[in-house]
Amino acid sequence: MSKLKAQSALQKLIESQKNPNANEDGYFRRKRLAKKERPFEPKKLVQQQQRLKEKKKNENIIYLKKTMRVTPSEEKIHEMINQKRETKKRKRKQKKKNDDDYGVFEEDMLEL
């Protein structure tokens, strides 16, 4: 920065500190005015809120996937339970067939 620019910047700073309302060329003052003149944009706010919700939802899903993962021992237990259910169903079917073989379910053979 040249000497002249540095001196003028220093003087502007001193003047703005003495009377902040007098100098309308101030950088921060322009920033404040620009902020006030900006129109209200609800679309952006809604989009930001949606992004935050989606982000939280994704984080929750990732966390649940990590914590709720089925361990190998749990998988074996589930397989054993399913096998027991299948064998029970198979036995019921076999029993029904056996009973049918003797004519229990045929109405012609039933004697009341």
Swiss-Prot record:
Span of the secretion signal? none
Q: Where is the composition biased (Basic residues)?
A: 86-96
* Feature: compositional bias, Acidic residues: 101-112
Question: Which Gene Ontology cellular component annotation is one that this UniProt entry carries?
Answer: nucleolus
Q: What are the boundaries of the region Disordered?
A: 1-53, 80-112
Bias type Polar residues, positions: 8-22
Primary location: nucleus
Q: Does the keyword Glycosyltransferase apply?
A: no
Q: Does the keyword Cytoplasm apply?
A: no
Q: Which keywords does this chain's UniProt record carry?
A: Nucleus
Where is this chain's protein located in or outside the cell? Answer: Nucleus, Nucleolus
Q: What's the protein here called?
A: Uncharacterized protein C144.01
Could you read off the lineage of the organism from its UniProt record?
Answer: Eukaryota, Fungi, Dikarya, Ascomycota, Taphrinomycotina
